[in-house]
């Protein structure tokens, strides 16, 4: 019996490997068919994540509408996509100048897209503006700019497209958010407030439009790092707060997030939280042991303020 088990083990492993390969290939093909011929709008397509989403959805045969602040950057992205695309399986992307912090033009741009295609099947709200500093040193003007870009811009774009989705009884809205929609981090008051606000809006919207078969999804990574950003090889220090902050800032790669956005669209997921164990634990502690969480975060602020500045 023991010899038979030993002989069967390689066959079992081979069978499992084969099934895993088939599943991965089927998932890849399913991902592409899920967006083929669909009109997909990506805001802030010039960011690292925006470019990767453009690459993934273009490969899947979507009719892309790429929105960005810089025309030269959009043309460069267009060239990069078309240079590797199969013309028989992909569509020519449409380029649109859009600054979500300029609310006066957002509605016009959204209407332009609808007039051009007649509908939008998938909207990926990706644009985000960040600011860091003590709350009392951040001007109200900057607070308003952050709210315009991260909250009012995305919801304005969404509200223009929503009636069309409801009347067609189909569509999906994906919000790429951030862990700071779950809890606040010191010196990021404006950014965290905008992320809390936009998460609240889309959580409410999800329930409102479910009866019309419109899907609302949120993808919240800890931090989308740049292509070159990696954690420094050094001693993290003994402080629990330092360890937490270092782990928190070591975020996920744009490629990972773009692939997760595609999976979210394909499976029509409602909420995805991308994080390593430490930030996930922080969310748990914030929810069930808030006083402990606040104490640890406050300790980190005091420790930072006690360190003398160089020079």
Swiss-Prot record:
Found, by tissue, as follows: Expressed in skeletal muscle, cardiac muscle and skin.
Q: What is this protein called in UniProt? A: Dehydrogenase/reductase SDR family member 7C
Which Gene3D superfamilies does the protein's record reference? Answer: NAD(P)-binding Rossmann-like Domain
Q: Which InterPro entries match?
A: NAD(P)-bd_dom_sf, Sc_DH/Rdtase_CS, SDR_fam, SDR_family_member_7C
- Output the Gene Ontology terms for molecular function: all-trans-retinol dehydrogenase (NAD+) activity; oxidoreductase activity, acting on the CH-OH group of donors, NAD or NADP as acceptor
What CDD domains does the record tag this protein with? 11beta-HSD1_like_SDR_c
Q: What induces it?
A: Repressed by adrenergic agents (phenylephrine, isoproterenol, dobutamine and clenbuterol), forskolin and phorbol myristate acetate (at transcriptional levels). No change in expression with endothelin-1.
Binding annotation for NAD(+): 47, 49, 191, 195, 226
Q: Which reaction does it catalyse?
A: all-trans-retinol + NAD(+) = all-trans-retinal + NADH + H(+)
| Keyword Protein biosynthesis attached | no
Purpose: NADH-dependent oxidoreductase which catalyzes the oxidation of all-trans-retinol to all-trans-retinal. Plays a role in the regulation of cardiac and skeletal muscle metabolic functions. Maintains Ca(2+) intracellular homeostasis by repressing Ca(2+) release from the sarcoplasmic reticulum (SR) in myotubes, possibly through local alternations in NAD/NADH or retinol/retinal. Also plays a role in Ca(2+) homeostasis by controlling Ca(2+) overload in the cytosol and the SR in myotubes.
* Biological-process GO terms, alphabetical: D-glucose import; intracellular calcium ion homeostasis; regulation of release of sequestered calcium ion into cytosol by sarcoplasmic reticulum
Family recorded in the similarity comment: Belongs to the short-chain dehydrogenases/reductases (SDR) family.
Q: Which UniProt keywords apply?
A: Membrane, NAD, NADP, Oxidoreductase, Sarcoplasmic reticulum, Signal
Share the domain note from the entry. Answer: The N-terminus region encompasses a short hydrophobic sequence bound to the sarcoplasmic reticulum membrane, whereas the C-terminus catalytic domain faces the myoplasm.
Task: Give the annotated active site.
Answer: 191 (proton acceptor)
Signal peptide (from-to)? 1-18
Q: Which PANTHER family match?
A: DEHYDROGENASE_REDUCTASE SDR FAMILY MEMBER 7C (PTHR44668:SF2), PTHR44668
Q: Where in the cell is it found?
A: Sarcoplasmic reticulum membrane
Record GO cellular component, one term: sarcoplasmic reticulum membrane
Q: Which Pfam families would you find in this protein's record?
A: adh_short
The broad enzyme category this protein falls into is oxidoreductase
- State its Enzyme Commission number(s): 1.1.1.105
């Amino acid at each position: 019996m023991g010899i038979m088990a030993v002989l069967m083990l390689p066959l079992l492993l081979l069978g499992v490997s084969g099934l895993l390969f088939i599943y991965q290939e089927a998932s890849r093909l399913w991902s592409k068919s899920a967006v083929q011929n669909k009109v997909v709008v990506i805001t802030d397509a010039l960011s690292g994540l925006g470019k990767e989403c453009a690459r993934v959805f273009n490969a899947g045969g979507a009719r892309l509408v790429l929105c960005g602040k810089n025309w030269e950057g959009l043309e460069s992205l267009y060239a990069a996509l078309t240079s590797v695309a199969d013309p028989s399986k992909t569509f020519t992307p449409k380029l649109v100048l859009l600054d979500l912090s300029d609310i006066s033009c957002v509605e016009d741009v959204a209407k332009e897209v609808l007039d051009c295609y007649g509908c939008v099947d998938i909207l990926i709200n990706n644009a985000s503006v960040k600011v860091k500093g003590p709350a009392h040193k951040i001007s109200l003007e900057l607070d308003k700019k952050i709210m315009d870009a991260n909250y009012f811009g995305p919801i304005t774009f969404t509200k223009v497209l929503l009636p069309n989705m409801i009347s067609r009884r189909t569509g999906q809205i994906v919000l790429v958010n951030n862990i700071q929609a779950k809890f606040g981090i010191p010196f990021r008051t404006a950014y965290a407030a905008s992320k809390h606000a936009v998460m609240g809006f889309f959580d409410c919207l999800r329930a409102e439009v479910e009866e019309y078969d419109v899907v609302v999804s949120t993808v919240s990574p800890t931090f989308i790092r740049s292509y070159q950003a990696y954690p420094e090889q050094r001693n993290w220090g003994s402080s629990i707060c330092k360890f937490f902050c270092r782990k928190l800032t070591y975020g996920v790669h744009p490629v990972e997030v773009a692939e997760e956005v595609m999976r979210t669209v394909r499976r029509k997921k409602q909420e995805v939280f991308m994080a390593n164990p430490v930030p996930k634990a922080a969310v748990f502690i914030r929810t069930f042991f808030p006083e402990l969480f606040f104490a640890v975060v406050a300790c980190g602020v005091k420790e930072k303020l006690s360190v003398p500045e160089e020079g």
